[in-house]
Amino acid sequence: MLLSELTHQSLSKITLEKYSNSFVPYLYLDGHRSGSNGFSDSEGYKNGYMFFLRFGRILKQLGFKQMVTMVHTQRNFSSKERIGTILKAITNNFDDKNEFIKNSLFKIYGDIDSYKQNGYSDFYKFLLDINNKPSMNQNFTHHILINYSEEWALKNLQKINCIPEISSVIRFTKGFVSGGWIPIKMQTTSFIYSQIPSISEFWSDESITALILISLNIWITTKEFIGTKSYCQNEKEMIHQKRDLELCSDTVKLEIQCPMHNRIIAFGINGPISYEF
């Protein structure tokens, strides 16, 4: 399958105006240490930050307005060396003159007071400076989860209510959402898994675009089946035949350029779908 076919498959079913606000991917960045063979952890986290920027820029170019990103959970905070490396990678590479950043609104969610209490006062001030800071043209919003936990979220539901409904969790290297569940915001959320990490050097713009379109297409085709779906007899028979009796699964080969081979696994109505490129 060509990227143009995937684009047509996804976007022919919708108008961007209809879903520009309601399609909100949740980017769960991961794999920067184990995937950074050949360069330091610091370079790995920098690569993760650059992937985040590129993903957001492409998402915005496609016409969408918001995304949610997990930086690190509160559980990660126990590893001081790791946290210090993550924070350094962010502050050293955050450029408020960057056109995409300059035209974005940042909203921060998590226990940021712990940074001040544990010797990271400069980073604490950095987060305060960017949180809800008016931008030149607030046509894209980043919802940033940092030092986040479900326990913090339950105690701060008023803040959590500012996060939009999550359409798709995009998880890298690991097939679970650990420490990153967002209460009341994940009622119709699909799950997308990338086998390779969110390391910028591993991804072309074309492959990031494919990741976004796969997430969009799966969300559109499955969200009506979550919780409130009423099945007619023909639907029951068709799904039962394909999913239960045939154990249906699909593999789609994408003809796109990418520095690394990858497998993206999604879950359709009839079974898993593996996109390989």
In which residue ranges do the predicted regions lie?
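Flexible, compositionally biased loop and terminal segments
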Residues: 1-277
